[in-house]
Amino acid sequence: MTKPNDRELYEGEIATYWFDDGILVSLSKSPKRTVENIKANVQLVRRITNNKPAPLLIYLSNSPVPDKAARKYSTEQLPVIYSAMAMVSKPGLAKFIMNLLFALKKPPIPMKSFTDDKEAKNWLKQYL
């Protein structure tokens, strides 16, 4: 996935964001997730979306496994900033992340993994 050059981009430490037909798109970057950089990312997303949860299409990248505190904070913030999440990745990566974050309880928002971004966008449209 490459960044578009026909719309406004929002750069953060852990991702680049843009809108595509009302869906917030995220191109994940590879630094290790920490509570600090996740907090900064939450603030960035809130600013981009005017504090309104938005459906997210995220292109996952390989990054180091976050520690327990970062995983906990991340899962607590999901429903604050996103209404649903579609993860696009190589087969297996999104499933690994889902198992890592939600092994013991279901996700706080609708989440689904895809290998095809067109299918992911179609699924997210129900959350617009």
Where are the regions that the model predicts?
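Amphipathic, Lys/Arg-enriched alpha-helical "gate/interface" segment within cytosolic domains
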Residues: 1-128
